[in-house]
Amino acid sequence: MLEVHIPSVGPEAEGPRQSPEKSHMVFRVEVLCSGRRHTVPRRYSEFHALHKRIKKLYKVPDFPSKRLPNWRTRGLEQRRQGLEAYIQGILYLNQEVPKELLEFLRLRHFPTDPKASNWGTLREFLPGDSSSQQHQRPVLSFHVDPYVCNPSPESLPNVVVNGVLQGLYSFSISPDKAQPKAACHPAPLPPMP
């Protein structure tokens, strides 16, 4: 899944020889792909260059005009909204995500066909010949229930476990059987009615 937003626009980071009056405006392009988010700073001219490259190869919406009203902040906000709608329009109109757009968004490992199977795309990231391997986490099991039979060397009985067992099964455990010294033997359960 690919989501693209342009949340803000602001002046480009100033270089040592650059005056604040001549700074260019940079659009902060926020990309969310497979749960990972990154930001790409792009100037209007870079958006326009992308448009020139892909307009004959793919379906693209109208590109936002460079001419804006004299009100600088309102015009920048209109341009930001227009560029965001333009990028989202490219994603919506095309069945495959254009390679040029992926480069523009700095995405390397993204399936260009959004209808591609997730399993097929995951295989390229797994090491070696993993098509027949199944990956799962190790399973932890206990031979003896650690809550019923605690092989602790403590001399004091476990009052909580004894109380729960007595309340649930209506039998009592003597302190000697509750905390065995060497081997752990589970408490006997009452016979089934």
UniProtKB/Swiss-Prot annotation:
Topology with respect to the bilayer: Peripheral membrane protein
Pfam family, one: PX
GO cellular component: cytoplasmic vesicle membrane
Residues the entry annotates as binding a 1,2-diacyl-sn-glycero-3-phospho-(1D-myo-inositol-3-phosphate): R43, S45, K66, R79
Top-rank taxon: Eukaryota
Transmembrane stretches, start-end: none
Keywords: Cytoplasmic vesicle, Lipid-binding, Membrane, Protein transport, Transport
GO molecular function term, any single one: phosphatidylinositol phosphate binding
Region (Disordered): 1-21
Expression (tissue specificity): Expressed in erythrocytes (at protein level).
Residue ranges occupied by any PX domain in the UniProt entry: 1-118
UniProt GO BP: protein transport
Domain notes: The PX domain mediates specific binding to membranes enriched in phosphatidylinositol 3-phosphate (PtdIns(P3)).
Subunit structure: (Microbial infection) Interacts with P.falciparum (strain 3D7) CK1.
Job of this protein: May be involved in several stages of intracellular trafficking. Interacts with membranes containing phosphatidylinositol 3-phosphate (PtdIns(3P)).
Assigned protein family: Belongs to the sorting nexin family.
Name of the protein in question: Sorting nexin-22
Organism: Homo sapiens (Human)
